[in-house]
Amino acid sequence: MQSAAAAFGLVRPCPARPPLQLGPGSSSCRPILLHARPLAAGIASSSRGPAAVAARSLGRLLLLPPPPPISPDRAGRGRARHVACGAAAGDAKAEEEESGLAKTLQLGALFGLWYLFNIYFNIYNKQVLKVFPYPINITTVQFAVGTVVALFMWITGILRRPKISGAQLFAILPLAVVHTMGNLFTNMSLGKVAVSFTHTIKAMEPFFSVLLSAIFLGELPTVWVILSLLPIVGGVALASLTEASFNWAGFWSAMASNVTFQSRNVLSKKLMVKKEESLDNINLFSIITVMSFFLLAPVAFLTEGIKITPTVLQSAGLNVKQVLTRSLLAALCFHAYQQVSYMILARVSPVTHSVGNCVKRVVVIVTSVLFFRTPVSPINSLGTAIALAGVFLYSQLKRLKPKPKAA
């Protein structure tokens, strides 16, 4: 019996004392001992064999204190974490909305700059060409200023200096040639006719784009695209018939500008100029600008001569400071609006860019009419409106792809 008692020494009755408090609202170990003692003692007195082993195990199990209840502090921390997670998700959503709003505002600012630079370029350019009828000199100055800006951006690191091979330069050369001719023909037209009329004729760019793509690339347009060209051609014809400043030199110069600019787009697809990582659209435009300057400068020297000098301007009775300042501003706006155009193209789809370009043409036409007080008849306005509506329709239909034929 003593050995049995020794085996259950763990369940000897404790001296009478207050139960041990584990915490607020918790139980003590004393009630468990009072219930465990009679049960264990009864088992021990009945047998010394396997029952004794079971009794010892039972005694150990019954002596374990109950698990402490969840502290109110822990529960509060859990609720706090849940609230914090919800708040973090709400903050992330708010930051995403703010980021989207910031991008929208940035894009709107770029469109505004694109239109503003274009307006000032056309105004200053027309003012200079009106009194200084040497478009090759003016175009050369514009390319020269663009070259200086491009070199400055490369040297200062504003624009990453491109790594370009001789083969790439050779492939870009045809693009530079047609780019040079396109801007030269535009300036020739602006010197002969009103700004509004030049831009009305240039609304026919989609017509030449479809024509040249079909001839050289084999890209046949859909019926809807062809139908959208009808109001463009009809509107330009109607505006030309009623244009007060119409002359054939200005008309054909603007048409030649359309052909050369759209040839540039076709050539870029035909030659498939491969761009390295450092040769983005702005770098490509900068390289073309530099090449255009070196292409046109000898032509200006051999044809018109170097006319844009203080001596020549003064002998012609012109305000030297005014002509040179406006020429410089026109050149800066010329380079700036084209760079901003490429920045917009990197952020939006080509269709959105095309629609923006159509709106830009409307803004330039209206602004030039108001600034220069160009006489415009109702029929002339109607023709311009029809042509621009056709351009907008063309840009919308161009994104529609024909459904594949079922096998």
Swiss-Prot record:
Its main location: plastid. Residues 123-240 form the EamA domain. The chain crosses the membrane at residues 104-124, 138-158, 164-184, 207-227, 244-261, 282-302, 374-394. It comes from the Eukaryota. SUPFAM superfamilies: Multidrug resistance efflux transporter EmrE. GO terms for biological process: phosphoenolpyruvate transport; triose phosphate transmembrane transport. It holds the Pfam family TPT. It is found in: Plastid, Chloroplast membrane. Residues 1-51 form a transit peptide. GO terms for cellular component: chloroplast membrane; Golgi apparatus. InterPro entries: Sugar_P_trans_dom (IPR004853), Tpt_PEP_transl (IPR004696), TPT_transporter (IPR050186). GO terms for molecular function: phosphoenolpyruvate:phosphate antiporter activity; triose-phosphate:phosphate antiporter activity. It is a multi-pass membrane protein. Belongs to the TPT transporter family. PPT (TC 2.A.7.9) subfamily. NCBIfam families: tpt. Phosphoenolpyruvate/phosphate translocator that transports phosphoenolpyruvate (PEP) and dihydroxyacetone phosphate. This is Phosphoenolpyruvate/phosphate translocator 2, chloroplastic. The lineage of its organism: Eukaryota, Viridiplantae, Streptophyta, Embryophyta, Tracheophyta.
